[in-house]
């Protein structure tokens, strides 16, 4: 059953996750998904438990139109499927004709965008907002409205634009930090004002870009300020420096804010790798939550701590996100980690012999070689047979 906005009251600590991997994520240069690939990713996202899937921008191409329609036909009974649309009737009609019942309308509200891109006055933009939202509502759509470049919009005009959208019937207001120029303190204050302005009936959403590496931090600040929905992409893919990362935002909401989502967190690693395979964009080695080194340890002090109690050097367990703990060998290794790795191979040595093996491992590593468990095993066996 698709969850509606009415299930998420202002007092609720359950936050909606709006995934835009298939729209904003795919806008990254070099990512061009086929309709079948988009459907496969959408199935994974629905199974993961996101609340909203932005399937595409139906008016932008025939392929986007078909993909949006097919995704809705496949999973529209499991999750809210939404399509992006400019604030004009042609785009709205195209989006409606896909069969979906939710639309994400946007128009820029910053002076910069209005002057150089839209070449429209404030009055013209406000008229577009009212007419497009009302038109979509008159056609029975759930409407989420985004004042594009909201964080660089003059405050009084931003609030006028938001009020105009709500008066026309908008159900949700999304606040995009379009080029990632916010920091958490400012974004918190901004979202707090907007939440208080719109009241409990309207869901406020956050949409953060990563141009200064703050997309996750800003998203969490916005949620902490009262936003009840966060826009994310798997692995943080997207234009320029990318978007707020689904896995980081979800785990931040859960572990740092102590709020809930409907996401099955133990599937995060699996979905991350699936999207990486489909898009051809690898997951960074040091990526938080789902990177291969997110739960990797080499330092002897750290490994000893993790062996005794993993939470000494891990804020969450790898199993909680479907990832794996990796104990590595190198010049920083200690005897406790070496003992554990060898015992997992069925090799048991005295402390004196472990020290000899450890010295050989460090010598190997300091020569610029990557030391594997197999190397340690061979050194140990050679010592045992000597």
Curated annotation (Swiss-Prot):
It is an enzyme of class 2 (transferase). Pathway: Amino-acid biosynthesis; L-leucine biosynthesis; L-leucine from 3-methyl-2-oxobutanoate: step 1/4. Transmembrane segments: none annotated. Its cofactor is a divalent metal cation. Keywords: Amino-acid biosynthesis, Branched-chain amino acid biosynthesis, Leucine biosynthesis, Metal-binding, Transferase. Its EC number is 2.3.3.13. GO terms for molecular function: 2-isopropylmalate synthase activity; metal ion binding. Pfam families: HCS_D2, HMGL-like. It catalyses: 3-methyl-2-oxobutanoate + acetyl-CoA + H2O = (2S)-2-isopropylmalate + CoA + H(+). Belongs to the alpha-IPM synthase/homocitrate synthase family. This is 2-isopropylmalate synthase. It comes from Saccharolobus solfataricus (strain ATCC 35092 / DSM 1617 / JCM 11322 / P2) (Sulfolobus solfataricus). The gene is leuA.
């Amino acid at each position: 059953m698709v969850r509606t906005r009415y299930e998420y009251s202002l007092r609720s600590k359950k936050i909606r996750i709006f995934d835009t991997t298939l729209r904003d994520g795919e806008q990254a240069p070099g990512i061009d998904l086929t309709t079948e690939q988009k459907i496969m990713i959408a199935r994974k996202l629905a199974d993961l438990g996101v609340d909203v899937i932005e399937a595409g921008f139906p008016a932008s191409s025939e392929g986007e139109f078909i993909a949006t329609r097919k995704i809705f036909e496949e999973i529209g009974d499991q999750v809210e499927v939404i399509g992006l649309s400019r604030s004009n009737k042609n785009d709205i009609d195209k989006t409606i004709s896909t069969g979906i019942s939710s639309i994400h309308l946007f128009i820029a509200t910053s002076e910069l965008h209005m002057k150089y891109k839209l070449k429209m006055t404030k009055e013209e933009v406000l008229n577009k907002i009212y007419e497009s939202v009302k038109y979509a509502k008159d056609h029975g759509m759930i409407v989420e409205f985004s004042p594009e470049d909201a964080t660089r919009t003059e405050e009084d005009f931003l609030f006028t634009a938001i009020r105009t959208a709500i008066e026309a019937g908008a159900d949700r207001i999304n606040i995009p930090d379009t080029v990632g120029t916010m920091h958490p303190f400012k974004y918190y204050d901004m979202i707090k004002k907007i939440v208080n302005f719109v009241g409990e009936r309207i869901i406020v959403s956050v949409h953060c870009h990563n141009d200064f590496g703050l997309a996750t931090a800003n998203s969490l600040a916005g949620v902490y300020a009262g936003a009840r929905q966060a826009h994310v992409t798997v692995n943080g893919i997207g234009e320029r420096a990318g978007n707020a990362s689904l896995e980081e935002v979800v785990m931040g909401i859960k572990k740092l804010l102590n709020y809930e989502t409907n996401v099955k967190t133990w599937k995060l690693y699996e979905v991350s790798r699936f999207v990486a395979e489909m898009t051809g964009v690898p997951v960074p080695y040091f990526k938080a939550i789902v990177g291969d080194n997110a739960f990797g340890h080499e330092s002897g002090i750290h490994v000893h701590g993790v062996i005794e109690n993993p939470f000494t050097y891990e804020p969450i367990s790898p199993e909680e996100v479907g990832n794996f703990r990796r104990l590595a060998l190198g010049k920083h290794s200690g005897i406790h980690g070496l003992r554990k790795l060898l015992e997992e191979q069925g090799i048991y040595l005295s402390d004196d012999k472990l020290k000899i093996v450890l010295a050989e491992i460090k010598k190997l590593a300091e020569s610029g070689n990557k030391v594997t468990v197999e190397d340690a095993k061979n050194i140990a066996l050679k010592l045992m047979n000597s």
